[in-house]
Amino acid sequence: MPEKVAVLLGGTSSERQISLQSGHAVVAGLREAGIDARPIDTKNFLVTELKEKGFTKAFIALHGRDGEDGHLQAVLEFLKIPYTGSGVMASALAMDKHRSKMIFQGAGLPVSPYVALNREQIWPNVTQNTSNDLLLNNRISNKLIKNINQLGLPLIVKPSREGSSFGMTKVEHLDQLDDALKKAWHYDEEILVEKWHFGTELTVAILGDTVLPSIRIQVSDIFYDYQAKYVSDKTQYFCPSGLKQEQEKQLATLSMNAYRALGCDGWGRVDVMLDDEGHFYLMEINTAPGMTDHSLFPMAARQAGFSFSELVCKILSLAH
């Protein structure tokens, strides 16, 4: 039976627009290679109908919740439809920055110092519309301030289960923390407050068992946020990254160890920070990286000799 591939895109997460761009690029790349690929927007399509519609494989181009977090992967496994990328557990863990950090720490891998906060546990009576100064009027906040003081300023506040830098804020003064937490809470009940590292942001693409050339990211703004990732033409990317050979080897080993620690499979991208003292810190793993014209995975693949069409065909060949 000829192969019929559903490229799952769009969805309902905050990363919907990025996913639409990624998915349509993937469809074009697969069709260029002669593969019967169809765009399927999961916002308007029941995934459980894929089998009866004759689809034999699924290329997951969804980003964020309900596409990258293990839910979709579980449905596809139930349907016995091979799909691209990591399995249920690895997808769920990678989507959850807090739990992935815990696993990295358990594996002896370096992560940035952080505090994990649950809104209901820390401030059970607070809503997003609360106008009180939380840091001054809530008795639990004293414990929070103590923990944060141990991290030191500046900080980065982010939702634990969100992508594309949605809900992230750099905090340079303690009085900015309240608004930063509320912004993050808009996206998730669990928030990470991390130590801010001055240094270089790097990303490492992994394709099958191969570590592709690393990319160094240079932003003109405060940090590598949504604007810098998908809109700005001022963000600069260097591939290869220009690291010393020994650092490049160290980065590749760290990235693969992190990838394996979560049980990732097929393809993925590992984000790493190199601080000014030469120390690497794992940030997160993306199990369904972006494939837009601003995306980093295709850039690393080009450096390794893959055309875009060859890349998406290789990813599809790794479906399980």
Curated annotation (Swiss-Prot):
Pathway: Cell wall biogenesis; peptidoglycan biosynthesis. Mg(2+) 2 binds at residues 284, 286. Binds 2 magnesium or manganese ions per subunit. The keyword Heme does not apply. Transmembrane segments: none annotated. Its cofactor is Mg(2+); Mn(2+). GO terms for cellular component: cytosol. GO terms for molecular function: ATP binding; D-alanine-D-alanine ligase activity; metal ion binding. Its EC number is 6.3.2.4. Signal peptide: none annotated. NCBIfam families: D_ala_D_alaTIGR (TIGR01205), PRK01372.1 (NF002378). Cell wall formation. This is D-alanine--D-alanine ligase. It comes from Hamiltonella defensa subsp. Acyrthosiphon pisum (strain 5AT). The lineage of its organism: Bacteria, Pseudomonadati, Pseudomonadota, Gammaproteobacteria, Enterobacterales. The gene is ddl.
